[in-house]
Amino acid sequence: MRTEESSYRDMYSKSRRSALPSGTEVPDFILRSTPDQWLTLSEFRGQPLVLAFYPADWSPVCGDQMTLYNEMLKEFHDLGAELIGISVDGAWCHAAFARDRKLHFPLLADFEPKGDVARRYGVYRDKDGVSERALFVIDAGGKVFWSYVSPIGVNPGADGILSALEELQSKNAKVAAGTK
């Protein structure tokens, strides 16, 4: 007999296996960053990037998560990284959410076709019509350095992102110095 908890565990473990793994070249995309502007992933080539997929604007956990990342922007920038949030909400919804939360990083609308980018990154929840709460650290060459899929109701915090960015920075410094 399957319990709700075991079904959740199965769904969670399946979603974790489907997220793009380390070393995978990330698919480029173009999404709305405002109702009249577009942003492409390729604009960030040459620098580390944090992609934070989240289920929906205005949900309590998503609001707390994006607010935390806004507070951590200086640390991300100090480690050479930019931050982008992505959900299936529309650009107008993102604009209101970002204004309300005083966010200072782009929120991209994976709205039409709904969830297309999340699907390509392996983090779309077909049953719910939203993306997983998934994090990717992408290196300057456009490959996944680190990824994590959090349970949908849990704020993953920023520690994993910071650790991955520090590790990436250390790796890059060793490569630049000619050591491995």
Regions found by a protein language model. Give the residues of each.
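Chalcogenol-based redox active-site neighborhoods
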Residues: M1-K180
